[in-house]
């Protein structure tokens, strides 16, 4: 991304993803999915599971897993999701941290910001609370489950922008997954990625500013 274009369109609001962006919950959540998928009979490595599931809505993950599990018991999908929610919640309570620089960033922002996520509101509130971020975010949580629009659909970001009182072109999106990056680009927003270039569609790379840490954002807003 051309940094000059970002500076020419001032950033007046920020929309963060949650898992893997503000909260270091992506890895433990993906690990739980990997453990449960392999226990159900799938043969995939931890790295393959992370690549397959990261940033993908749970319904699509469940469809992918169920299609590969032979001789499924009745209510397999509902039971799997219930067990995943319970197990991941316990894992979060055992050990969960904010992403490096997250508290410092959100506590010092002078422009409106919120969190837009493909995760359920209850889970997001829990992880933000466990990491000390919830007081800064407040009720500015936009869950795809509440609004029926999941990334890469840009609708959730556009809703967040309207609620924050800004036009899309003056909003920044901070993401760590390909579906989130696609949604941010489609929304016409400034897009910052904690996800490396590998695996990001080439056609959007020129519209994404790749960063290595949240502290890199200090010079932008």
Predicted regions and their residues:
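Short helix-capping segments at alpha-helix termini
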Residues: 39-43, 69-75, 132-136, 165-166
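Short beta->alpha linker loops
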Residues: 28, 53-57, 97-101, 119, ...
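A short, glycine- and basic residue-enriched loop/turn
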Residues: 19, 26, 47, 96-99, ...
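Hydrophobic residues in well-ordered beta-strands that form the structural core
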Residues: 24, 115-117, 193
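Helix-loop "lid/cap" segments that line or gate small-molecule binding pockets
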Residues: 34-37, 57-72, 127, 161
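Active-site neighborhood of HAD-like aspartate-dependent phosphohydrolases
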Residues: 2-51
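Asp-based, Mg2+/Mn2+-dependent phosphohydrolase catalytic module
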Residues: 1-12, 107, 111, 120-221
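Metal-dependent phosphoesterase signature
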Residues: 39, 65-104
